[in-house]
A protein has these predicted regions:
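Hydrophobic cores of alpha-helical transmembrane segments in multi-pass inner/ER membrane proteins
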Residues: 16-25, 91-97, 161-175
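Structural signature of hydrophobic alpha-helical transmembrane segments
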Residues: 80-91, 163
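Membrane-interface helix caps and helix-loop-helix hairpins in membrane proteins
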Residues: 72-81
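A structural-propensity feature for long, helix-poor, extended segments
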Residues: 111-143
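Short aromatic-rich membrane-water interface segments that cap or initiate transmembrane helices
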Residues: 1-10, 148-163
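Membrane-water interface at loop-to-transmembrane-helix junctions
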Residues: 41-60
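Individual transmembrane alpha-helix segments
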Residues: 1-26
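Alpha-helical transmembrane segments
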Residues: 98-113
Length: 185
């Protein structure tokens, strides 16, 4: 029973994060049609080439992302989980943009990626948990094998739901950062 309520609570929190990011996107988005003015404005937000920061980020960015993924994947076995792992991964992407700039970061994380990942994660979470609304079912016997206790794949739907929460949190942190800093992703 506790898992049922926690899962719906977490889904609600993830939806609130997504709605907040969407509202910030609408309110702070800078929709200039003049491409020259936009290019000049975007150039202003590119970081100055800082050799020390870039060298540090080349080492730290992969380590931060791996640690975030580790926290995310082990959240059902140890302290951590989706929110913690997502916050760490979001901080890693923010480090990348500060070291290498928006142009390089947009090669792997742009507004389209943000929308696909967040909507996909929230949709999966909603579909995975919504059956209890219709059946009144308990979430623990979900039909997914629980595996051996202590293994990564040992918790039914908890691991995929942690991954969904982590993706939403990481994307939202980066979206807030870029929207507050320059008015767009």
């Amino acid at each position: 029973m506790i898992l049922d309520y926690r899962a719906f609570d977490t889904f609600g929190e993830s939806c609130v994060l997504f709605i907040a990011a969407a509202c910030v996107l609408v309110l702070l988005r800078d929709d200039q049609t003049d491409t020259t003015a936009k290019a000049i404005r975007d150039e202003r937000f590119e970081p100055v080439s800082d050799t020390i920061l870039q060298a540090s980020a080349k080492i730290l960015f992969p380590a931060i992302m791996i640690f975030g993924i580790y926290i995310l994947l082990n959240g059902h076995l140890s302290p951590g989980g989706g929110f913690s792992g997502g916050a760490i991964m979001g901080a890693g992407v923010i480090l990348h943009v500060n070291a290498f700039g928006y142009k390089k970061t947009q090669k792997f994380f742009n507004e389209k990626t943000y929308k696909i990942v967040t909507v996909g994660a929230l949709s999966f979470y909603c579909v995975a948990k919504s059956y209890s609304f219709f059946t009144g079912a308990n979430h623990i016997p979900s039909g997914i094998p629980l595996g051996n206790a202590g293994d990564i794949i040992s918790s039914g739907l908890i691991l995929p739901l942690n991954i969904c929460v982590g993706l939403v949190v990481a994307c939202t942190m980066y979206a807030f950062y870029t929207l507050f800093k320059k008015g767009g992703m």
